[in-house]
Structure formats: structure tokens, C-alpha cells
From Swiss-Prot:
Induction: Expressed in the early phase of the viral replicative cycle. InterPro entries: Prot_L2. It is a multi-pass membrane protein. Early protein involved in virion morphogenesis. Participates in the formation and elongation of crescent-shaped membrane precursors of immature virions in cytoplasmic factories. This is Protein OPG096. The chain crosses the membrane at residues 39-59, 67-87. Interacts with OPG158/A30.5. It is found in: Virion membrane; Host cytoplasm; Host endoplasmic reticulum membrane. The gene is OPG096. It comes from Vaccinia virus (strain Western Reserve). The keyword Transmembrane helix applies. Belongs to the orthopoxvirus OPG096 family. GO terms for cellular component: host cell endoplasmic reticulum membrane; membrane; virion membrane. Keywords: Early protein, Host cytoplasm, Host endoplasmic reticulum, Host membrane, Membrane, Transmembrane, Transmembrane helix, Virion.
Length: 87
């Protein structure tokens, strides 16, 4: 149990360090642009980070659960065929 808590503590510390680095990079990018464009740069970076997180989550979800997702797709197709052709 101690190994797991130590690993979780290491992950938390690494996440904090990564967040500080990303904030440093974003701050540097913001100050290279005119003041009018800074909110747009922040918005673009936030959207980009959001898309990256969604992509990573989707790849992980599909790679770990592809059998269940295929069964779900087959079920939806079957129910759609039943709905349109039988009823």
C-alpha cells in the first residue's frame, strides 16, 4: 500500500511541475504578442490543451474497451434496423 501512495505522491508532484512549466510557456507566448491579442492567445491555448486531453482520453478509452464499443455499435445498428424495417 505504501508503494501506491508513494507513486501517487510522485504523480501529483510531477503534475504540479508540468503545470508550472506550461504556465511559464503560456506566459512567454502571451508577452510576445500585442496586448489586444493576449486573450485570444489564451483562448487558443486553452482550446488546444482541451483537444489534446480529449484525444488522449478517447485513445485510451478505445484501446482499453474496443470489444465493448464494438458490441455497443452492433447493438445500435441492430436496434436501428429493427426500428426502421420491422416497426
Amino acid at each position: 500500500m505504501e508503494v501506491i501512495t508513494d507513486r501517487l505522491d510522485d504523480i501529483v508532484k510531477q503534475n504540479i511541475a508540468d503545470e508550472k512549466f506550461v504556465d511559464f510557456v503560456i506566459h512567454g507566448l502571451e508577452h510576445q504578442c500585442p496586448a489586444i491579442l493576449r486573450p485570444l492567445i489564451r483562448l487558443f491555448i486553452d482550446i488546444l490543451l482541451f483537444v489534446i486531453v480529449i484525444y488522449i482520453f478517447t485513445v485510451r478509452l478505445v484501446s482499453r474497451n474496443y470489444q465493448m464499443l464494438l458490441a455497443l455499435v452492433a447493438l445500435v445498428i441492430t436496434l436501428t434496423i429493427f426500428y426502421y424495417f420491422i416497426l
